[in-house]
C-alpha cells in the first residue's frame, strides 16, 4: 500500500508551495490533482512583497521577478482621462527588498513551481481524484480514483486540502463555509493592444459602479482586463462575450484591442471555513477562504497558509516537535483570513457601490484624496504594508512571546538595509535561528553553539533603530521567519524555556 507523510490534494500554487517546502525538508510528499494538465490560463496575477520575501527560502524570488512584470505606478481614470498617478515603488521603499507590485500570471507561476518540485523527484499525479478518506488513529486512509479508473487505497500521516473553493476535503470533513456570493459577474480578458493604458502601469477606471482595471503583463503590448458587470448581462454569464463588455475599456480608457488571447467569466464568493483543521486533515488556500480579487490577496494568502503549515508538519514528522504544534495552524491563519475577507469586501463594496453619493466619492473625492494620502508618509506606509501583507502578524498567539524595541513576538522581522548588509540574508535557511542587533552575552553564544542553533549577531547601526529593532536583546525566529520571541535580555534560558513549554526541539534546515 502506498504510504506518504503528507498527501496533498490540489496542485495550484498553494498545494505546490506546500509540496516544495516539505520536499526541501525531507518529508515524503504525494500531490494529486483531478485536472489532466496544469492550467494554461489564470485569474491570479499579483505576487505581493511578503510572498517574494518568503520565496527567498525556496530560491524562487529571483525567477519570479525576472520573468514577471514590475508595476511602477497605479493610474486612476475619470471621464476618459487619467486624473491621478500613484507611484508604487516609492510607497514601500525601505520596508522590504521588494518595494513594488509584481505581476506574474498564475499559469506561469505554477509552471515554475512544478519545475522546482520535479527537481526533488516529485511529480504531480494528474487525472487522479480523491473520493474520500477516514482517519485511522495514527494516520489517514484515502481512496483515490486513478487515471485508468482503478480505485487505490493509500495511507498518509496527514492530508492537506488545497483543492479550491469546491473542496472535497472540506465537504468530507463536513466543515461549514459561511459567507455569500457577489451579485456581479467578473470577466477577465488577455489582450494584445495599444493605447495610453498599455504603458506598463496599472490603470483603473472609476467612472462606473462596475469595476474595470487594465493590468500590464510581461511583453510588449500585453495586458489583462479585469472587470465586473451587474446589469442584465450578468443574468447570462455563460453566453457573455468579450464584445459585450469591451466598449467601456475602448471608450473610457482608449484601449485599442488588436488581439484577444483569452476571455472568461466567473462569479466571486466571500467565505471562510469554520475550521482549518480537523484531526489529521487541514484546509489551505481557496479550500479554506475565498474573497474578492480586490488587492490581489487570494493566491498570496494561500501560499502563506502553505508556508505556515509546512514547517510545523516537517517538525512534527521529524520528531522535532510534539503534535500539539499543529494546533497553532488554525488560529494563526483563520484570524488573518477573516480579517482579509472583511477588508476586501469593504474595498470591493466601495469600488462597486451604486448611487449619486457613491459616484461622487469615486469620481471626485477619491482622485483628489489619493495623491494627498500618498504624500503622507504614514498613510503611504500603511497602504503598502496592508496590500503587500508585510503587516500580517501573529501577535497574541500561543507561539508568540515578548517585545523588544517596536517588534513583538509574532511580528514579521523588520527588514533593515543600509548598504552594509541585509538582515534578511540569513533567513534563506529553513530553520530556527537567533538574531541579535548590537551585543550579546558569552552565555548566549555558548548555548547556541552547544545546541546547534544558528546565531547571527549584527553590529548596531542606525538602520536597525530606524526599523524598530531593539538593541542587544535577541529575536528567536521561526523557520517561516516570523518572530517567536522578542526579548530585551541576552539570557539563553529564555529560549530553552520557550522550546520546552511548546514541546519543540528545533528542526534544522534541509537534510
Which residue ranges define each predicted feature?
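Core beta-strand elements of the Rossmann-like FAD/NAD(P) dinucleotide-binding domain
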Residues: 2-4, 148-158
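Glycine-rich FAD pyrophosphate-binding loop
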Residues: 23-43
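FAD/FMN-dependent oxidoreductases across multiple families
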Residues: 67, 237-297, 301, 321, ...
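N-terminal Rossmann-fold NAD(P) dinucleotide-binding loop
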Residues: 15-16
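A conserved short coil-to-beta-strand element within the FAD-binding core of flavoproteins
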Residues: 126-140
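Active-site-adjacent segment of FAD-dependent monooxygenases/related oxidoreductases
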Residues: 40-44, 48-112, 116-118
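Helical substrate-recognition/capping region of FAD-dependent monooxygenase/halogenase enzymes
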Residues: 1-5, 9, 25, 34, ...
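Conserved FAD-binding catalytic core of PHBH/FMO-like flavoproteins
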Residues: 82, 115, 122, 158, ...
Amino acid at each position: 500500500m502506498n504510504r506518504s507523510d503528507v498527501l496533498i490534494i490540489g496542485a495550484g500554487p498553494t498545494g505546490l508551495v506546500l509540496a516544495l517546502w516539505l520536499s526541501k525538508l525531507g518529508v515524503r510528499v504525494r500531490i494529486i490533482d483531478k485536472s489532466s494538465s496544469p492550467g494554461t490560463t489564470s485569474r491570479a496575477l499579483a505576487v505581493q512583497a511578503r510572498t517574494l520575501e518568503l520565496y527567498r527560502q525556496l530560491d524562487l524570488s529571483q525567477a519570479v521577478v525576472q520573468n514577471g512584470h514590475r508595476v511602477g505606478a497605479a493610474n486612476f481614470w475619470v471621464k476618459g482621462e487619467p486624473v491621478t498617478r500613484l507611484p508604487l515603488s516609492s510607497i514601500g521603499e525601505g520596508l522590504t527588498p521588494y518595494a513594488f507590485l509584481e505581476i506574474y500570471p498564475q499559469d506561469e507561476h505554477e509552471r515554475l513551481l512544478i519545475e522546482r518540485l520535479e527537481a526533488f523527484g516529485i511529480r504531480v499525479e494528474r487525472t487522479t481524484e480523491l473520493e474520500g478518506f477516514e482517519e485511522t488513529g495514527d494516520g489517514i486512509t484515502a481512496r483515490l480514483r486513478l487515471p485508468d479508473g482503478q480505485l487505490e487505497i493509500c495511507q498518509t500521516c496527514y492530508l492537506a486540502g488545497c483543492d479550491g473553493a469546491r473542496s472535497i476535503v472540506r465537504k468530507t470533513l463536513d466543515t461549514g463555509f459561511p459567507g455569500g456570493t457577489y451579485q456581479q459577474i467578473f470577466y477577465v480578458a488577455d489582450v494584445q493592444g495599444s493605447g495610453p493604458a498599455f504603458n506598463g502601469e496599472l490603470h483603473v477606471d472609476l467612472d462606473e459602479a462596475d469595476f474595470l482595471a487594465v493590468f500590464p503583463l510581461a511583453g510588449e503590448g500585453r495586458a489583462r482586463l479585469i472587470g465586473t458587470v451587474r446589469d442584465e448581462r450578468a443574468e447570462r454569464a455563460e453566453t457573455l462575450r468579450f464584445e459585450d463588455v469591451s466598449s467601456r475599456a475602448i471608450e473610457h480608457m482608449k484601449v485599442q484591442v488588436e488581439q484577444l488571447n483569452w476571455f472568461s467569466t466567473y462569479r466571486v464568493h466571500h467565505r471562510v471555513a469554520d475550521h482549518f483543521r480537523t484531526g489529521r486533515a487541514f484546509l489551505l488556500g481557496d479550500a479554506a477562504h475565498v474573497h474578492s480579487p480586490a488587492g490581489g490577496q487570494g493566491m498570496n494568502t494561500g501560499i502563506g497558509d502553505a508556508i505556515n503549515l509546512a514547517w510545523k508538519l516537517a517538525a512534527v514528522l521529524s520528531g522535532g516537535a510534539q503534535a500539539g504544534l499543529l494546533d497553532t495552524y488554525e488560529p494563526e491563519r483563520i484570524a488573518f483570513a477573516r480579517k482579509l475577507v472583511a477588508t476586501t469586501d469593504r474595498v470591493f463594496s466601495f469600488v462597486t457601490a451604486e448611487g449619486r453619493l457613491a459616484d461622487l466619492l469615486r469620481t471626485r473625492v477619491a482622485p483628489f484624496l489619493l495623491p494627498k494620502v500618498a504624500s503622507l508618509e504614514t498613510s503611504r506606509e500603511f497602504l503598502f504594508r496592508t496590500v503587500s501583507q508585510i503587516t500580517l502578524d501573529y501577535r497574541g498567539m500561543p507561539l508568540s512571546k515578548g517585545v523588544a524595541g517596536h517588534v513583538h513576538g509574532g511580528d514579521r522581522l523588520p527588514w533593515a538595509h543600509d548598504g552594509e548588509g541585509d538582515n534578511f540574508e540569513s533567513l534563506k535557511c529553513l530553520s530556527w535561528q537567533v538574531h541579535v542587533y548590537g551585543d550579546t552575552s558569552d552565555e548566549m553564544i555558548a548555548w547556541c553553539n552547544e545546541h546547534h542553533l544558528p546565531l547571527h549577531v549584527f553590529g548596531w547601526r542606525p538602520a536597525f533603530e530606524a526599523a524598530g529593532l531593539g538593541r542587544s536583546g535577541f529575536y528567536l525566529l521561526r523557520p517561516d521567519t516570523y518572530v517567536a520571541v522578542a526579548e530585551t535580555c541576552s539570557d539563553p534560558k529564555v529560549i530553552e524555556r520557550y522550546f520546552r513549554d511548546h514541546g519543540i526541539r528545533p528542526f534544522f534546515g534541509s537534510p
